[in-house]
């Protein structure tokens, strides 16, 4: 039996490798870890606690807010504000960014962007959901209020990113730019413990994840790629397997471990795609690149996109490098940015 290493111990050990580290990022990750435990507890008893279902209101995306969406947003907001390591937060559930105004917070150097509960519409049927987070250094002067520009940074400036998947077991996966590590929650001791060290995504996979019910709305490049995935060819081990849960965190997590590609393209009714660049696509892109994979909008690197709006959307292709490369080749050959279903 190997020695159990908690996430806290792992982070402190890594921090010791950098003598100039101040410990602020370590404390920030601890706050996220704490909030994840609280949210996990509520998800596990959701059917008994009258917090399943809709609030009857819509968030800024025009999506009906689930009760747990609101709960998770408040828990992460409270945890991030409490210790003062964050000067502001942007969330899928908030129309504008949130500024933390304590003296300690105003002098902190980090901002967090978060999707507090991805896939929450699946909770009623007991399907896995998750939390996605992204951390940047602010660009505004410490001591002053946080600004929109602090959040509108390209993904290549992220200092950390990760997700929590609340499933048959609860797991937190994160990167600080030095590889990807996963920690499984042990409820008997109340700690996330190292279970997946130095995760590497297979260069090639056999799984494609996309909502094929929207096929008629897809750009031609995606349609051609799907046909390629479904064709029989022993040399390339096709046809591939279609697996789509409908929760970005769950689909991404499976493909990260097993190899595969997740696609949410533009469509005739959503020319800019559906997924949010800043707090869904960029953090997953940082993770997959650190694990040896690739993330694209179909034509170029996701993390090189300069954001212009807090809730900006983008088409998304993420997963095993060779699969994303091949999907991009189909997009370049059969689609263009000018087509109504391909405007990124």
From Swiss-Prot:
Q: Which domain of life is it from?
A: Bacteria
Which pathway is recorded for this entry? Carbohydrate biosynthesis; gluconeogenesis
PROSITE patterns (alphabetical)? FBPASE
Q: Does the keyword Oxidoreductase apply?
A: no
Q: Which GO terms describe its molecular function?
A: fructose 1,6-bisphosphate 1-phosphatase activity; magnesium ion binding
Name the keywords, alphabetized. Answer: Carbohydrate metabolism, Cytoplasm, Hydrolase, Magnesium, Metal-binding
Protein biosynthesis recorded as keyword: no
Tell me the enzyme class: hydrolase
Q: Which SUPFAM superfamilies match?
A: Carbohydrate phosphatase
Question: What S-S linkages are listed for this chain?
Answer: none
**Catalysis performed (reactions):** beta-D-fructose 1,6-bisphosphate + H2O = beta-D-fructose 6-phosphate + phosphate
UniProt EC number: 3.1.3.11
Quote the record's binding site residues for Mg(2+) 2.
Answer: 115, 118, 280
The UniProt note on the cofactor reads as follows: Binds 2 magnesium ions per subunit.
Checking CDD domains in the record gives:
FBPase
Q: Which Pfam families match?
A: FBPase, FBPase_C
Cofactor(s) recorded for this entry are: Mg(2+)
Q: Which residues bind substrate?
A: 118-121, 211, 244, 274
Single Gene Ontology BP annotation: fructose 6-phosphate metabolic process
Q: Which GO terms describe its cellular component?
A: cytosol
Q: Where does Mg(2+) 1 bind?
A: 92, 115, 117
Subunit description: Homotetramer.
Name of the protein in question: Fructose-1,6-bisphosphatase class 1
């Amino acid at each position: 039996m190997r020695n159990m290493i908690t996430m806290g111990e792992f982070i402190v050990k890594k921090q010791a490798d950098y003598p100039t580290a101040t410990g602020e990022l370590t404390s920030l990750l601890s706050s996220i870890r704490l909030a994840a435990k609280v949210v996990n507890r509520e998800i596990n008893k959701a059917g008994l606690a009258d917090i399943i279902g809709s609030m009857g209101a819509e968030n800024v995306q025009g999506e009906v807010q689930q009760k747990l969406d609101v709960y998770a947003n408040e828990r992460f907001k409270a945890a991030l504000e409490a210790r003062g390591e964050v000067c502001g937060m942007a969330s899928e559930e908030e129309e504008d960014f949130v500024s933390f105004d304590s003296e300690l917070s105003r002098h902190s150097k980090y901002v967090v962007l978060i999707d507090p509960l991805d896939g929450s519409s699946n909770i009623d049927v007991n399907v896995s959901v998750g939390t996605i987070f992204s951390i940047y250094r602010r660009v505004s002067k410490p001591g002053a209020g946080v600004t929109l520009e602090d959040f509108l940074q390209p993904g290549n400036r992220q200092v950390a990113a990760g997700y929590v998947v609340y499933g048959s077991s609860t797991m937190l996966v994160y990167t600080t730019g030095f590889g990807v590590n996963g920690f499984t929650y042990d409820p008997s001791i109340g700690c996330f413990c190292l279970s997946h060290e130095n995760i590497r995504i297979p260069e090639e996979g056999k799984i494609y994840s996309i909502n094929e019910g929207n096929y008629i709305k897809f750009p031609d490049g995606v349609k051609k790629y799907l046909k390629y995935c479904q064709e029989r060819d022993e040399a390339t081990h096709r046809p591939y397997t279609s697996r789509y849960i409908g929760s970005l965190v769950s689909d991404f997590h499976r493909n990260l471990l097993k190899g595969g590609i997740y696609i949410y393209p533009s469509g005739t009714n959503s020319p800019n795609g559906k997924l949010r660049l800043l707090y869904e696509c960029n953090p997953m892109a940082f993770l997959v690149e650190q694990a040896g994979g690739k993330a694209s909008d179909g034509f170029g690197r996701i993390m090189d996109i300069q954001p212009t709006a807090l809730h900006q959307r983008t088409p998304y292709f993420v997963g095993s490098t060779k699969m994303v490369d091949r999907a991009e080749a189909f997009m370049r050959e059969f689609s263009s940015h000018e087509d109504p279903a391909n405007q990124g």
